[in-house]
Amino acid sequence: MENQGGDYSPNGFSNSASNMNAVFNNEITGRSDISNVNHQTGTPRLVPETQIWSMPVPDQLMTMPNRENTLMTGSTIGPNIPMNVAYPNTIYSPTEHQSQFQTQQNRDISTMMEHTNSNDMSGSGKNLKKRVSKACDHCRKRKIRCDEVDQQTKKCSNCIKFQLPCTFKHRDEILKKKRKLEIKHHATPGESLQTSNSISNPVASSSVPNSGRFELLNGNSPLESNIIDKVSNIQNNLNKKMNSKIEKLDRKMSYIIDSVARLEWLLDKAVKKQEGKYKEKNNLPKPARKIYSTALLTAQKLYWFKQSLGVKASNEEFLSPISEILSISLKWYATQMKKFMDLSSPAFFSSEIILYSLPPKKQAKRLLENFHATLLSSVTGIISLKECLDLAEKYYSESGEKLTYPEHLLLNVCLCSGASATQSIIRGDSKFLRKDRYDPTSQELKKIENVALLNAMYYYHKLSTICSGTRTLQALLLLNRYFQLTYDTELANCILGTAIRLAVDMELNRKSSYKSLDFEEAIRRRRMWWHCFCTDKLYSLMLSRPPIVGERDMDMLTDQNYYEVIKTNILPDLIDKKEDLDKITDVNSALNVVVNFCQHISLFISYYVSKLVSIESKIYSTCFAVRSTLDLSFDAMLDKIKDLNDSLNNWRDNLHVSMKLKSYKQYLSVLYAQKSQENPALSFEIACSRVLNCHFRALYSKVILSMMTTSLLIDNERLYKGSRHDIPQLFILFSSQYLNASKEMLQLFQGINYQAHMYNEVMYQFSTAMFVLFFYVVDNMNDLKKKGEVKEIIDILKKSYDRLVGENDEQLLFDNVKWNTLIVFYSHFLKYVLQRYHALNDSTSIFDSKPYDETITKVIMHSRKIKDETVDQLIMSLKSYGSLHSLQKGNEADLADDGLNTNDISSEDFAEEAPINLFGELSVEILKLLKSHSPISNFGDLSPSSNRKGISDDSSLYPIRSDLTSLVYPIHSSDTGDTLSSGLETPENSNFNSDSGIKEDFEAFRALLPLGKLIYDRDYSFVNTFRDYE
């Protein structure tokens, strides 16, 4: 039956309101329901579903907006639901229907291919947005009409208006679910059969034309294939472009998200790290409270040495040579101090100051030459030989020109040091330095040294309170060197403190004070400040005292400062081309240039010494400062110690070839052979001695740091479990490190040609290594596993001893009390160690200790002679002052013109109270005690009892049994109360620790020492001894 109302047959499309609404209305569901129509009819899709939604819709078939058809409640709407459809204005008759339909269909295809934007609707005068097959997520959410996506902005007009992203996530999810349902639906047998039947008849044929139904295109027609191919290609290209852009955007977003996440992780880690530092500073356990010092040889350690070796001799026999050399040295020092305090002020006659007379001019010049030849490394560059000779010329000139106080001080210090140096020269094989027939005796030289020193002390007291210029600073630095080598470091430190104070007053610690000076004067002042700074750090470690100057108190001696000095003042004279000069941009490249010129080698060496001194300063502040164990936790302290150890290793590894031990002699010899120098032999000797002294100083720092670390670990066993460090590994590292460094120092000493002034330069570091190796041998002599290592160390000690005293004891006797004391301790320790070693190893040869006893006797007799001569000088000075008569009242029988006859005087002849008092007037009793040969007994009231330490209060840095790694392995024990096992002790020492009478025995042992204390530890500590007097 003909249907003129526009309805289609059930198997085709219908023009009814319900079908049209189901096909084209997507306001709610976001998609057309044409797929449902296809499923109902059973006809296959000619265009893939993903492409159908983007196909343009003919304007003639667009539905008009109407309230009834804007909201759809489902996809299965009945066919009788009304729908307003805009039909064409001209209605054709049924006979013309087919031809008109073909014409209209071609027109629609052209419209689809051109993507027309016309939104005119038949029957409506309004311009509406062109309807699209799917709405974006934003329009769907707001329930507004969506339009086509702009190709430039990739957004619909609504998203452009609201500045929002235009996405279709909701639609994509619906399509994905739809595909899954279709796949599941077609998997059934019935559907498969239906699908196969549909494929055989892809397009349902229409009924007779009179039925009023429009016939669809035949699937096999060329027009239909062209349409489908064009539409498919267009959509595929669009999809590929869109997918590519989405993938790129997705990758960018993923990268941004990952970057943000990593940034958050880094920030969180940084916050936790800062919190960890705060926690470590405040909450982590701190080491046991203890103020460590660099002391090595103490009364407790001396007692342990005797007990560990199992010496059968009594305490009196064991301490006899030690007590005697210490008593002699103490009397000698007291005599010298009384001369400085009482006789350094000249006498007044007729309102004229009468100073001690100096030697003749020729002799004075010869002494000054010897003094300059033996300066070597300690005060290199402080004063030139020309300056010394000019002072002598001015002093002895007949023009009557007088010297100023600073010049008097400088001249007397140089003559005093020259007389002391000449005494060592005339004893050895260094007589090649002599140019004339001046051959003074030892007595003459000692007299010159004595009077020049008294004159120098007179001017020192005049100038020590006022800054008078560089002459005074030169003299103070030279006087400091003399006291350190001849007397003790404590006395020298007092002179150094005055020198540093004057240097700071002159602003030598600031770069700005050098700007207006010429280069030579600036270098001279720079050298003086360098010596102040480096000597201060050395004394700080030796005395366990805080340094006077810190790095924050100056802007000198930095890398930048060295670079500026070299680049501005030195390189322009060495490099002609400006292009080559511009290539030097840092201190290392600048130093690589100046090292090839011998006139600048001193500046080159000073740079590396300055770097080492900075490390020494950090070692003191970390390990030996008063608050070291209060401010730092146990782990933080170990962290800093490891960094310091790495700094020492890096310093040595990064040395220039001219500073390395294996090559410095070859490099410097070639350098000085090629360049002309005023005295190339002396310059070469000075440069070599500075390099050697630098290495001894570095090895000493490593020994001190390593021993302190092992002592710290032993003292804090309770903190092993909570530590994040590998304690056993650290213990083994530092225990072997101080041992190897000590052996290297002695082996290095064996390669030094004998020169007394050179030996004096390294005597403190050498004695440190010597005592460390002695203690190690005693500590491990009973360990069979270390038998070979102990034998090796004993051989090193014997070779070093032979090198020290020389063949046939030619270098044995020396007019230096510190040197003689070292020889006595070395001989005494080596005798007992060799005796014990031969006894343990069942040697067939009998050990003969007689050579060592004879050496000790020779040294003690020579030291006694030096002390007696010093006392005689004091008596002669008293006679010259006229003060001797006041002391002879009531004692004429005891005093004679040739001195005091006190050979038969013993300590029992004196009063019970301590007679030696530096801060009182001289008396006959004091002179008798100073001249007597008896040891000084233990006077109980000399030192306050509160300052006396028991056997358990050992301040020695050497750790007992520090080599046993089992000491640190209780970290693995489950019992938190575990302590050091007593099984670690040797049989001899088990009784040593368990005997209840040890304390009394130690007190009796210590009472045999002069004044009840050990005043020698690689250097004398006289000042503290007399400071404790009450």
Swiss-Prot record:
Source organism, top-level taxon: Eukaryota
Low complexity: bias regions: 196-208
InterPro entries: AtrR-like, Transcription_factor_dom_fun, Zn2-C6_fun-type_DNA-bd_sf, Zn2Cys6_DnaBD
Location(s), subcellular: Cytoplasm; Nucleus
Any one GO molecular function term: DNA-binding transcription factor activity, RNA polymerase II-specific
Region annotation (Disordered) ranges: 185-208
DNA-binding region location: 136-166
Keywords: Cytoplasm, DNA-binding, Metal-binding, Nucleus, Phosphoprotein, Transcription, Transcription regulation, Zinc
CC terms in the record's Gene Ontology section: mitochondrion; nucleus
UniProt xrefs under CDD domains: fungal_TF_MHR, GAL4
One Pfam family of this chain: Zn_clus
GO biological process terms on file: DNA-templated transcription; positive regulation of transcription by RNA polymerase II; response to salt stress
Claim: Zinc is one of the keywords in the record: yes
Statement: the UniProt record of this protein carries the keyword Metal-binding: yes
Classification via Gene3D superfamilies: Zn(2)-C6 fungal-type DNA-binding domain
Primary location group: cytoplasm
Phosphoserine modifications at: 221, 937
Note: Present with 238 molecules/cell in log phase SD medium.
Function: Putative transcription factor involved in halotolerance.
Protein name: Halotolerance protein 9
